Amino acid sequence: MFTYHSANTSAAQPALVNAIEQGLRAELGVVTEDDILMELTKWVEASDNDILSDIYQQTINYVVSGQHPTL
């Protein structure tokens, strides 16, 4: 028997964006919202895991909707 637990993606999205921002900042020095969106888009396209792809897509929507503080 399986128990369904809803993922708390509302907490995961800011953390994922911050992690991407830190990685890109270390690599590029300066990070824009477009850089983060491009990185997430690459991850969606490269992922074979539907769950991860969905999380990445939700995070893209989170960034585009303006819920993440401006970089």
Curated annotation (Swiss-Prot):
This is Protein bdm homolog. The gene is bdm. The lineage of its organism: Bacteria, Pseudomonadati, Pseudomonadota, Gammaproteobacteria, Enterobacterales.
